[in-house]
């Protein structure tokens, strides 16, 4: 079901502004019926940080090829692949500055799939999202029949949105249940314990003081020992724990956060680049330029020019 009339949005503008210091992405759902389908494309050099969310996500690779980062794993994905992301897993879609990538992303809260049936049955439907172990195969590749079926059902859901009538909501739930069944059947041999979800939440709670420190003090020098102290851990334990939980070192996460702030500020032509570098915690404009280019793929000046055109 290829369709040239989808409303494609830039991945960066659609994703990055909704990510806070903890890397939590807030999605603009219709709260009365929290499910949405978006059509996204890569638009030049951009940095999208590792992020996590409480909702569930299914990505269809519409065109191009890239890597999906899930924590510290880089998973190749190409046109026709599916990507399945559960709650509270740090992840992002990576792409080269000049690569043409289009994705179709369906995000939904689990209550959409719950309709009064026995709790055990509902959990089976959602189990591919709720029990993703560290080696879980998030990318479904070389299964074109499955990918085609899921993509076509996602498009059907999109056509029913916004689902403001009973008939439309019944249609969306029916199509979603069909998708969930297809994924459950595919992942039957990979489903682990549901206790994994609670374990992940506990790990993230232990890191909350570090994220709070980052949000409040990113304009100032922050050392690993400062974040470790905030979390009541030794520096060595904190570094290992942070990397295991988030997928990046604390220093890399802090740098990405600062550069993400800089990207936003560069869209305002009134603020000098030298001032922006200081506002996001860099003492040297030249070093800021080096780091920005390494992470974003272009210089701050060129990024500003492209953003304002």
Stretches with model-predicted labels:
Residues 36-53:
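Conserved short histidine dyad/triad with adjacent acidic residue
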Residues 2-39, 90-159, 189-190:
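A hydrophobic/aromatic-rich effector-binding and dimerization subdomain
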Residues 141-196, 209:
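An amphipathic alpha-helical interaction segment
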Residues 51-68, 84:
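Short, conserved beta-strand element in jelly-roll/cupin
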Residues 181-189, 203, 209-260, 271, ...:
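Basic/polar phosphate-binding segments, predominantly the helix-turn-helix DNA-binding elements
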Residues 62, 151-162, 211, 215-218, ...:
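Regular secondary-structure segments
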Residues 72-86:
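Short acidic-glycine-tyrosine-enriched beta hairpin
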Residues 123, 147, 151, 169, ...:
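Short, structured helix-loop boundary elements
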């Amino acid at each position: 079901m290829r369709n040239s009339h989808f409303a494609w949005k830039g991945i960066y503008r659609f994703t990055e502004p909704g990510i806070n210091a903890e890397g939590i992405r807030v999605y603009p759902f219709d709260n009365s019926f929290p499910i949405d389908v978006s059509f996204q494309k890569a638009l030049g050099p951009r940095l999208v940080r590792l992020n996590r969310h409480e909702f569930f996500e299914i990505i269809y690779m519409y065109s191009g090829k890239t890597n999906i980062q899930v924590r510290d794993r880089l998973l190749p994905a190409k046109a026709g692949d599916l990507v399945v992301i559960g709650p509270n897993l740090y992840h992002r879609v990576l792409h080269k500055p000049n690569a043409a990538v289009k994705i179709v992303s369906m995000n939904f809260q689990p209550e959409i799939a719950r309709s009064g049936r026995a709790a055990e049955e509902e959990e089976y439907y959602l189990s591919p999202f709720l029990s993703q172990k560290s080696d879980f195969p998030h990318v479904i590749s070389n299964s074109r029949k499955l990918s085609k079926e899921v993509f076509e059902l996602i498009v059907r859901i999109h056509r029913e949105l916004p689902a403001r009538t009973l008939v439309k909501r019944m249609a969306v739930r029916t199509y979603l249940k069909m998708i969930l069944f297809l994924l459950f059947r595919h992942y039957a041999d990979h489903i682990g314990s549901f206790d994994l979800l609670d374990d992940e939440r506990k790990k993230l709670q232990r890191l909350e003081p570090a994220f709070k420190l980052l949000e409040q003090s990113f304009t100032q020098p922050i050392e690993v020992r400062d974040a470790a102290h905030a979390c009541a851990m030794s520096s060595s334990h904190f570094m290992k724990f942070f990397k295991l939980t988030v997928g990046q070192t604390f220093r890399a996460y802090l740098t990405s956060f600062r550069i993400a702030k800089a990207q936003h500020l560069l869209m305002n032509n009134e603020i000098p680049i030298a001032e922006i570098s200081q506002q996001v915690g860099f003492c040297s404009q030249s070093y800021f330029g080096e780091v920005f280019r390494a992470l974003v793929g272009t210089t701050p000046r060129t990024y500003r020019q492209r953003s304002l055109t």
